[in-house]
Amino acid sequence: MQEQYVPQSIEPAVQKHWDAKKTFKAVEKVDKEKFYCLSMFPYPSGRLHMGHVRNYTIGDVISRYQRLNGKNVLQPIGWDAFGLPAENAAVKNNTAPAPWTYENIEYMKNQLKMLGLGYDWDRELATCKPDYYRWEQWFFTKLYEKGLVYKKTSSVNWCPNDMTVLANEQVVDNCCWRCDTPVEQKEIPQWFIKITDYAEELLNDIDNLEGWPEMVKTMQRNWIGRSEGVNISFAIEGQAEQLEVYTTRPDTFMGVTYVGIAAGHPLALQAAATNPGLAAFIEECKNTKVAEAELATMEKKGMATGLYAIHPLDGRKVPVWVANFVLMNYGTGAVMAVPGHDQRDHEFATKYGLDIKAVIKPADGEVDVSDAAYTEKGVLFASGEFDGLDFQGAFDAIANKLEALGHGKRTVNFRLRDWGVSRQRYWGAPIPMLTLADGTVVPTPEDQLPVLLPEDVVMDGIQSPIKADAEWAKTTYNGQEAFRETDTFDTFMESSWYYARYCSPDYDKGMLDPAAANHWLPVDQYIGGIEHACMHLLYARFFHKLLRDAGLVNSDEPFKRLLCQGMVLADAFYYKDEKGGNVWVSPTDVKVERDEKGRITKAIDNDGREVIHSGMTKMSKSKNNGIDPQLMVERYGADTVRLFMMFASPAEMTLEWSDSGVEGAQRFLRRLWRLTFEHVSAGAVPALDVAALTSEQKAVRRELHKTIAKVSDDVGRRQTFNTAIAAIMELMNNLAKLGSDEQDRALMQEALETVVVMLSPITPHIGFELWKMLGKGDDVDHATWPVADEAAMVETEKLVVVQINGKMRGKLTVPAEISQADVEKLAMADASVQKFTDGLTVRKVIYVPGKLLNIVAN
């Protein structure tokens, strides 16, 4: 029994014990309620950062809590191992992505173990292994056979430096999010999965996600973007083709004064063939910013095509303009423009001298659209037969007329677009499609799967090795020459179903073992960043429905409850170099002085240079303000780091790293160790006799059981882990009131056992050791979470403070149900009260039941 708390000596030993005993191995048990807890798996970048530590600690606390509550817990871990950073690192370090990735996995695995995370390592998977992506390829061919996969030429965001397609969300200020290179528009053939076929279900089922944060649900609803409107066909003067547009505001249709089309629209390209100026403008539009946030703020530009559309209801000719804010891959690539009632259209019309016509006004007034569009719904005017109609009346009447004339159709539209899964990179799962000599495209036969990605490659930093190697693509199909697809899957493919593969990671007869999948799924608790709301979390929901429709799972949704943890922030410091640039200095290399409010007033780096404090910001490589978790674990121990992470902030809020906060967490653990050591060193502990407890002892026991109730609710239901820890710390202060008689010691034993079990999900190593120290036979990992004793929480007595003229003059311990009159009698009979009322006349008595008696006398 060690007198001092030395985490560096106990933590490795406890971790070895867990490994040897396979404490966290999960086995399907039909007689025990299951709980599947999952944190988003890491990309093996080389080292864990504090964001990982926070995510995985939260998941581990929930898992351990559920295990102590008798659940059969599955908590697996694996590696989201494909992706561009491995290629960039391989080029930089003159290696191949595979060895770089596998080395990182090994290193990070040891880091995860060092944190004491209770994973079932037998289920570990890496998405870059053929036994994983084989089933992804197989599933893709099945989706192709069902008509849910297609290939088409598509305008994409192209990064010329990384030579890959970027999603709209990966374009920041018209530059690549990874390398800051200006993005171009490029037409290339791509594979798509029809997520739009599931748009309605994905939207409707959001209502069933009761355990998800409202913000994430709102983000997904907006991303899917269901709208009801009308598809309208315009005839083009002198052309056989019709121009299709979609609008949610057919009530404004009589106010159309021009039509905007995308630079890639067939009509635009046709007009440009004889118009060099237009051709040059279209070329310029190829580099238009396409991230939606930027579309709203960028300069609107356009050029007339010389073509005219015929308004289908009043026969007016309206000019057709190429506009840089109309995108070919959104909707039909054309929009009807109503500058009187749409501000973007108004700005464009004003800039280019186009007509602005008002057709909607408030029900109780007039409208002026000379300076700005009137965008509210109202009553129609200047609209012929539709004058006087309100929004819904006009919507129906105009839609009906367009349908009757064969120029329109009511339709439900979605902002969501089909999922482009092709990537022009090497380090990803090969797309399992073949092209035959005659151009026919077929899926790779099942007996040829997996299509293996060669790992022994040389990276030149320019072209994918499987694109550069003509021999790799050559294969046969039914005796014919065939060529493999050289694009690889978007890495969101792997992360869209990994949670299901954990249920049977070694199963080789299919993608999933249905019995195991249906035993564990859906995931009961998922933990990850809110930045994944509209991509990973939506794709995983989509994939789950695909798996269900393939008969592989029988649930509709993958994740019952979702917790989005906040970011980890740290102080950032910099100084200016000779050129005026910022040189960022690690906070671990800076000494600071603070004022009385804790604000930094001066900061000096290790070279004696005064540095500028730029505030608390997200830990990042760019600002050099990441705190190395390994360094912190080596210095303070994993339990201290875990305790600080869970205590310093509510789980879903940002967490500010603080050395003093970490030191405070360690002081608390030392105090707990010392208290337990002193208690155990005092010898054998008698049995607790509740009936024999004094009122002071009952008060301590009452606080103990109130704490059990609060911590159970905070951890289990509310997931406010910081308030649970605060309650345990407060309880520890109360334990100091206990003396050394037999029932004091018996009560201390009950309290320490309770505290150790309740803290063990957060600080499992010290929990393991203290449980043994307290003489408990089995591991704390197999203990039972304490249950609050309702009888102990009932207050039979109250402590009433007695004041004379607002000053405290005594305290009374009284029965809980005592009347005011009886409290007054006891107070007036109390010697210390009599001393201050002697010779005075009582004028008034104020009583706060069970708390305070204030006697006003003069």
UniProtKB/Swiss-Prot annotation:
Its main location: cytoplasm. GO terms for cellular component: cytosol. A motif ('KMSKS' region) lies at residues 618-622. A motif ('HIGH' region) lies at residues 42-52. Keywords: Aminoacyl-tRNA synthetase, ATP-binding, Cytoplasm, Ligase, Nucleotide-binding, Protein biosynthesis. GO terms for molecular function: aminoacyl-tRNA deacylase activity; ATP binding; leucine-tRNA ligase activity. The keyword Protein biosynthesis applies. ATP binds at K621. Belongs to the class-I aminoacyl-tRNA synthetase family. This is Leucine--tRNA ligase. It comes from Aeromonas salmonicida (strain A449).
